[in-house]
From Swiss-Prot:
This is Probable glycine dehydrogenase (decarboxylating) subunit 1. One of its GO terms (biological process) is glycine decarboxylation via glycine cleavage system. Gene3D superfamilies: Aspartate Aminotransferase, domain 1, Type I PLP-dependent aspartate aminotransferase-like (Major domain). The lineage of its organism: Bacteria, Pseudomonadati, Thermodesulfobacteriota, Desulfuromonadia, Geobacterales. Keywords: Oxidoreductase. InterPro entries: GcvPA, GDC-P_N, GDC_P, PyrdxlP-dep_Trfase, PyrdxlP-dep_Trfase_major, PyrdxlP-dep_Trfase_small.
Length: 445
């Protein structure tokens, strides 16, 4: 059942009705010596801390996997308001809001979602969501081909390898190519990326933080791309945008990413949602649906699906994409998540993620034979070099109920000993110390 506390005004009104001057008067008949002096209650807890305790009691010792895995999908807190509001019948539907006269609530929610994404990314226009982060990167690549009328995309190899596969798949069959540029250690090779841009380049695609967890400034790369008439596409991790410079601040033309970390739980790969935002001058090349604000014939504010001539149900052969459904419910969860935290709360969440990952980075890299591979700033994720292959080490720790990270040898040849570890705000110091102890034991055996 719901719990709605009484406001001070409501309390005063109720006391006045029963003729009492204060709440204390209600307990006056109870002798003072019989009244409880203290209830011996622990200090107040956050919603997440209380949920953790209740889950521990419910599990009664049952084993659960402790995740230190990232690679694009992350284990973050989800305020109870997200589940409660997104499950309301008004929102919980697969219906596409083509009829604005009976869809104002849904349309306004999606309009506010677009506003939140623009504020996060530093961009001017957003659509109403895409399938996931990978398809968002690929749609941005196609968008750059349309805008520049060129046929070459440069892909930084420190972009999520699964997302790079999707880009390659999207470009297959088109008269376009994706050229990969190898990273410099665990960071983007900015010099090589700049040197790869030519008159046939439609866009340069980078990720910040990248797949190794490294954070970089791409402002100079944006200038180099623009000098050659190319675009800069930045794939971002939304939680990191509470601390790091937004794609817009770096001069990017298109910002994309996976919105899973905004109020959507880990769920065997989905459903999640992808976000895409761009400069206003590129709005007619944005894929998917866009919700706009307008005025009806009676002067009332209303919301509608706008610029629909870009979409396949109007001009299929000229459509910017063939997205037959989007992830509106997941995007709504993202909006509620952002609204629940607010600007200050979002910044505090990002800082908490950064601090906990910094502790884990220091703790794990101090183990014998373990070295940190990231040269500069990291966020959430960081990459360790182990004294042995990472895959069997991860397998061993999994038997103890700990998913230690992502072995990078499966994606990058020659990096068999590299392990990408992720630490979010949900991981406690005790859990990080447990990972360190188990990792140390596995490396010594």
């Amino acid at each position: 059942m719901g719990y709605c506390p009484n406001t001070p005004d409501e309390i005063r009104e109720m006391l006045a009705v029963i003729g009492a001057g204060s709440i204390e008067e209600l307990f006056a008949p109870i002798p003072a010596e019989l009244r409880a002096k203290s209830f011996d209650l622990p200090p107040g807890m956050s919603e997440f801390e209380l949920m953790r305790i209740m889950r521990e009691k419910a599990a009664a010792g049952g084993a659960e996997i402790l995740p230190f895995i990232g690679g694009g999908i992350y284990d973050h807190i989800i305020p109870a308001a997200v589940d409660h509001l997104s499950s309301r019948a008004e929102f919980y539907t697969a219906y596409t809001p083509y009829q604005p006269e009976c869809s104002q609530g849904t349309l306004q929610a999606l309009f506010e979602y677009q506003t939140s994404i623009c504020r996060l990314t530093g961009m001017e226009a957003s659509n109403a969501s895409l399938y996931d982060g990978g398809t968002a990167v690929a749609e941005a690549a196609l968008m750059s081909l349309r805008i520049t009328e060129r046929n070459r995309v440069i892909l930084d190899a420190s972009v999520n390898p699964l997302h790079r596969e999707i880009v390659t798949g999207y470009l297959h069959g088109l008269s376009a190519e994706a050229v990969e540029v190898a990273p410099d250690g665990c960071g983007s090779n900015l010099k090589a990326l700049s040197g790869s841009i030519d008159e046939e380049t439609a866009a340069v695609i980078v990720q910040n933080p990248n797949f190794f967890g490294s954070v970089q400034d791409f402002s100079e790369l944006a200038l180099k791309a623009h000098e050659k008439g190319a675009l800069l596409i930045v794939s971002g991790y939304p939680i990191a945008l509470g601390l790091v410079a937004s794609p817009g601040e770096m001069g990017a033309d298109i910002a994309v990413g996976d919105g899973q970390s905004l109020g959507n739980p880990l769920s065997f790969g989905g459903p999640y949602f992808g976000f895409i935002a761009a400069r206003k001058r590129f709005i007619r090349n944005l894929p998917g649906r866009i919700v706009g604000e307008t005025i009806d014939n009676q002067g009332r504010r209303g919301y509608v699906l706008t610029l629909q001539a870009r979409e396949q149900h109007i001009k299929r052969h000229k459509a910017t994409s063939n997205i037959c459904s989007n992830q509106s419910l997941c995007a709504l969860r993202g909006l509620i998540f952002c609204a629940s935290l607010g600007k200050k709360g979002f910044e505090e969440l990002a800082l908490l993620n950064y601090d906990k990952a910094q502790y884990a980075k220091s703790r794990l890299s101090s183990l014998k034979g373990v070295t940190l591979m990231n040269a500069g700033t990291t966020f959430n994720e960081f990459t360790l070099s182990l004294p042995k292959d990472a895959a069997p080490v991860v397998e061993k720790l999994l038997s103890f109920g700990v998913a230690a990270g992502v072995p990078l040898g499966q994606y990058y040849p020659g990096m068999d000993s590299a392990l990408a570890v992720t630490v979010t705000e949900k991981r406690s110091k005790a859990e990080i110390d447990r990972l360190a102890a188990l990792l140390e034991e596995a490396l010594c055996s």
